[in-house]
């Protein structure tokens, strides 16, 4: 299993560190982080004054009964120090639709983020992208469920194939996403 190395994180995080990028669920390892891990990370980042950029683009792709936990939902401290990014591109297979979203619960951090967006000339997404994103989230749930079942079937096929034909290879079953 793969776990966050908090001892190493403590060792490398000095006064120059301002930000931590979290892949939640982890990609490419396919790990759905536990509540305990996220709580510990939130406490660490809040105490160190780090902004957590939580990439949650695979959040709707938890597999085999696993449940994604949004980082900002862990605690008030997590919400106060995080910006969560997501997009419909992975879940709904619409990578050509250039659209993403950011959730910034803390008002002060949100103001800083919006100021950064304006300074770097990041405007609104094209209207077609916004419409496609809304349609995907409103109308795509049945498609998403079928896609997850298909991915789980592919993973089970790979596990079976390896077990029967190349037993030296023991694939790790992902808890989220689509990589084995």
Question: What residues fall within each predicted segment?
Answer:
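Amphipathic alpha-helix from the class-I
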Residues: 107, 127-149, 160-166
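Glycine/threonine-rich helix-loop capping motifs at alpha-helix boundaries
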Residues: 117-126, 169
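Conserved glycine-rich beta-strand-loop-beta hairpin in the small C-terminal domain of fold type I
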Residues: 134, 149-159, 170-180
């Amino acid at each position: 299993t793969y776990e966050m190395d908090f001892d190493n994180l403590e060792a490398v995080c000095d006064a120059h560190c301002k930000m931590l990028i979290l892949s939640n669920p982890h990609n490419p390892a396919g790990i759905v982080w536990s509540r305990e891990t996220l709580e510990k990370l939130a406490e660490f980042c809040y105490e160190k004054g780090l902004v957590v950029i939580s990439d949650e683009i695979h959040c709707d792709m938890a597999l085999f009964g696993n449940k994604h936990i949004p980082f900002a939902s862990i605690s008030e401290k997590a919400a106060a120090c995080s910006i969560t990014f997501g997009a419909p591109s992975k879940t709904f297979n619409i990578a050509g639709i250039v659209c993403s979203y950011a959730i910034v619960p803390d008002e002060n951090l949100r103001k800083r983020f919006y100021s950064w967006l304006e300074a770097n000339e990041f405007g609104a997404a094209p209207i077609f992208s916004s419409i496609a994103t809304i349609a995907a989230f409103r109308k795509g749930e049945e498609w998403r469920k079928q896609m997850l079942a298909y991915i789980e079937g592919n993973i089970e096929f790979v596990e079976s194939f390896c077990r029967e034909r190349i037993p030296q290879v023991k694939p790790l079953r992902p808890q989220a996403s689509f990589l084995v």
